[in-house]
Regions:
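N-terminal helix-rich structural modules
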Residues: 1-167, 189
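Post-HExxH zinc-binding segment in Zn-dependent metallohydrolases
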Residues: 207-217, 355-389
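Active-site recognition of the HExxH zinc-binding catalytic motif
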Residues: 323-342, 362-366
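Beta-rich nucleic-acid/ligand-interaction surfaces
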Residues: 293-302, 352-362
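Extended, well-ordered alpha-helical scaffold/bundle regions in very large, multi-domain proteins
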Residues: 52-56, 64-69, 193, 197, ...
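Glycine- and acidic
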Residues: 154-161, 193, 200, 204, ...
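C-terminal, non-catalytic "cap/extension" segments appended to globular domains
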Residues: 3-15, 46-47, 91-92, 187-190, ...
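Active-site-proximal, well-structured secondary-structure segments within enzyme catalytic domains
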Residues: 129-137, 144, 170-318, 388, ...
Length: 535
C-alpha cells in the first residue's frame, strides 16, 4: 500500500494509516460479496451463484497477502500500539489473515464448492406425489396433517436434498480440512473455533454441562409430549417416529397447549406487526423492510437470513412469510439481527462496525424471536386478551420450545465436530441418528440409512456456526435478566438498553468482554436454567 502519507516516527499513527488503507480496500469487496450473496438467494440463478464464488474469493485473496499478515502480526507483538480500538482492529485483521494464507487456486476452489452447494439449496424443491413442493408446503403437512402415511412421505421428501448434497459437502469438508492443516491446524472445525475466539475444550465442557442440566427435565417433557402425540395419532409412544413431529428435524416443538398461536397470526399482517413493534422499541426497521424480500416465489432461497451489505445502513432480510407463529418469530428474529446492524454508531471504524460476535447478534435475534410466546407482547403488540390460565399456557409453550430447540442444537454441534474430524467415516448416517436419539429422544426409522444430516443447510452454507445458537440462547436469558435488573421501562426501555449497552460497542471488544459490559457477568448457563429448567 504505497502512496499513503505516514506520520514519521509515530508507530501508532503509522499502524492506523495502514489499517485504514486496508479497510478502504476491503469495504467495496465486502459490499460486492454481500450483494452477490443476496442476488444468489433471491434469484437462484447460476450466474448469480458464479458471481458469489468470485466475489467471496476476492475478499479472501485480499487477506491471503503474506506481507500484510506479517505486518499485522509484528504490530500486535510490539508494545507500541496503546490505543485499544486500534489494537482490536489489528486483532480482527490477524484472525482474517490467519485463515486465508492460502494459494489463490485453493481460495477459488473453496469458494466455488461452497457457492455451488448454496445454489443447490436455493433452487432445490422436494418432490411429493410427483410434484415439486416448497418447504412451507411440507411444514404445513407436518404441522396439520393427520394422515400418518402422508406425514411420513412429507418428512422423507424434506430429506431428499441430503442425497444431492452429501458427497459435495463431504468433498468441501475434505478441502477445508486440507486448507486448515496447511495453516497448522488439526482440522477446519478447530481452526474456525480459534478464529471465532472460542476455546474448543471450554465450549464442549459448557455444552456437556448444559446437557446434564437439562437431561432430567427434558426427559420428563418428552414423556408428556410423547403421550400427547401418541393420543393424537392413536398409537403407542414407542411407535412414534420423526414424521409425527411438526418439524423435519424435531428442532421445534409440536403445537400443543390451550392457546393456538398460529390462530392468533392467521390473517394478520406480519410485516406491519413487526414494523410497529420495532418502532415501539425505538429501533425503527421501516427502511430495512422496504429493502427486504419477504415472500415466496420459485427459485428463491427458502432459508431466512439477514445481511448487512455495506456497514453503512444497507441491511436486508430474506423470508418466505406465511401468517403463522413460526414465521412471525422468524421475522422478529431476523429483524433483531437487522436492528443490531442498523443501530450501531456510524462513527465506529469500519472494521469495528459489526456485532462483537456471531453469538452476540444471535442473542439479540433470539430475544426478539421469543416474543411470540411472551404474554405481554401478545397483549400489547397483537391485542390478544389472554386469561391468567392462557398466559401460563403460553409461558409453558415458551419453556417447551426452548428445551426442544436447545437439545437439537446439541445434535448439530456434536455432529459437525465429528464430521470435520472424519468426513470419510462410513457411519456418519448412523452417528447422526445416535445423536438424535441421545439428545432429542426421537427414534430413528427402522432400516433407514440416508444422509439425513446433509439436508440441514447450515452444514453447507454456515460452517462451524450452530454452537453459536446455543450460546446465543444462554446470552439471551442473561441479557433479559440484565434488562429487568436495569429498571428499563416498557419496550422503549428495552430498546435503549440494547442500543446503549450492546449495539453501541460494535466489535470494540470480544464477545466475552461485551457480555460483561452489558450484564456485569461472564457467560453462564445459570440464567437460562433459572428461566426454563429450575422452575
Amino acid at each position: 500500500m504505497t502512496g499513503v502519507p505516514v506520520p514519521f516516527g509515530n508507530p501508532g499513527a503509522e499502524a492506523q494509516v495502514w489499517v485504514d488503507a486496508h479497510a478502504a480496500r476491503l469495504a467495496p469487496l465486502l459490499r460486492e460479496a454481500h450483494l452477490a450473496e443476496w442476488e444468489s438467494a433471491v434469484t437462484g440463478s447460476e450466474q448469480a451463484s458464479a458471481g458469489l464464488a468470485q466475489t467471496r474469493a476476492a475478499v479472501k485473496r485480499l487477506f491471503s497477502d503474506p506481507e500484510g499478515a506479517r505486518r499485522v502480526r509484528d504490530l500486535l507483538d510490539s508494545d507500541e500500539i496503546e490505543d485499544p480500538l486500534l489494537r482490536r482492529q489489528l486483532q480482527l485483521l490477524h484472525l482474517e489473515f490467519t485463515a486465508n494464507q492460502l494459494p489463490p487456486e485453493t481460495i477459488r476452489e473453496l469458494a466455488e464448492l461452497s457457492a455451488a452447494l448454496e445454489h443447490t439449496f436455493h433452487t432445490f424443491r422436494a418432490t411429493l406425489d410427483g410434484a415439486a413442493v416448497t418447504d412451507n408446503a411440507l411444514l404445513e403437512i407436518l404441522r396439520d396433517g393427520d394422515d400418518v402415511a402422508r406425514r411420513r412421505a412429507a418428512w422423507e421428501a424434506s430429506k431428499q436434498i441430503g442425497r444431492h448434497v452429501a458427497e459435495p459437502l463431504r468433498e468441501l469438508v475434505r478441502r477445508r480440512n486440507a486448507a486448515a492443516r496447511s495453516l497448522g491446524f488439526a482440522d477446519f472445525y478447530r481452526m474456525e473455533l480459534e478464529l471465532q475466539e472460542l476455546d474448543e475444550e471450554r465450549l464442549f465442557a459448557l455444552l456437556d454441562e448444559f446437557k446434564r442440566a437439562t437431561d432430567t427435565p427434558f426427559a420428563a417433557l418428552r414423556e408428556r409430549m410423547d403421550r400427547a402425540l401418541a393420543g393424537r395419532f392413536d398409537t403407542a409412544p414407542e411407535e412414534l417416529r420423526p414424521w409425527h413431529w411438526s418439524d423435519p428435524f424435531g428442532q421445534e416443538a409440536p403445537p400443543e397447549g390451550a392457546v393456538d398461536l398460529d390462530a392468533l397470526f392467521a390473517g394478520g399482517d406480519l410485516v406491519q406487526l413487526a414494523a410497529d413493534f420495532f418502532r415501539a422499541l425505538g429501533l425503527p426497521m421501516d427502511e430495512v423492510l422496504a429493502r427486504s424480500d419477504l415472500w415466496e416465489r420459485p427459485g428463491k432461497g427458502q432459508h431466512a437470513f439477514c445481511t448487512d451489505i455495506d456497514r453503512e445502513g444497507d441491511v436486508r432480510v430474506l423470508c418466505n412469510l406465511r401468517p403463522t407463529d413460526r414465521w412471525m418469530a422468524t421475522l422478529l428474529h431476523e429483524l433483531g439481527h437487522a436492528a443490531y446492524d442498523v443501530h450501531r454508531p456510524g462513527d465506529l471504524p469500519f472494521l469495528l462496525r459489526t456485532p462483537a460476535h456471531t453469538l452476540s447478534t444471535e442473542a439479540v435475534a433470539m430475544l426478539m424471536g421469543r416474543l411470540t410466546r411472551d404474554p405481554r407482547w401478545l397483549r400489547e403488540a397483537m391485542g390478544a386478551e389472554l386469561t391468567r390460565e392462557a398466559q401460563a399456557d403460553v409461558g409453558e409453550q415458551l419453556r417447551t420450545s426452548m428445551l426442544v430447540s436447545t437439545r437439537w442444537m446439541l445434535v448439530m454441534a456434536h455432529f459437525e465436530r465429528a464430521l470435520y474430524r472424519g468426513p470419510d467415516r462410513e457411519d456418519l448416517n448412523q452417528l447422526w441418528w445416535e445423536l438424535v436419539e441421545e439428545m432429542q429422544r426421537i427414534r430413528r426409522p427402522e432400516g433407514r440409512d440416508e444422509p439425513d444430516w446433509a439436508a440441514k443447510i447450515h452444514l453447507s452454507s454456515a460452517p462451524v456456526y450452530y454452537h453459536n445458537y446455543l450460546l446465543g440462547e444462554l446470552m439471551t436469558s442473561q441479557l433479559g435478566a440484565a434488562i429487568r435488573r436495569s429498571g428499563a421501562e416498557g419496550w422503549e426501555g428495552m430498546g435503549h438498553f440494547l442500543r446503549d449497552r450492546v449495539f453501541a460497542r460494535g466489535a470494540q471488544e470480544d464477545w466475552a468482554g461485551l457480555l460483561v459490559h452489558a450484564t456485569g457477568e461472564p457467560l453462564s448457563a445459570r440464567f437460562f436454567v433459572e428461566q426454563f429448567v429450575a422452575g
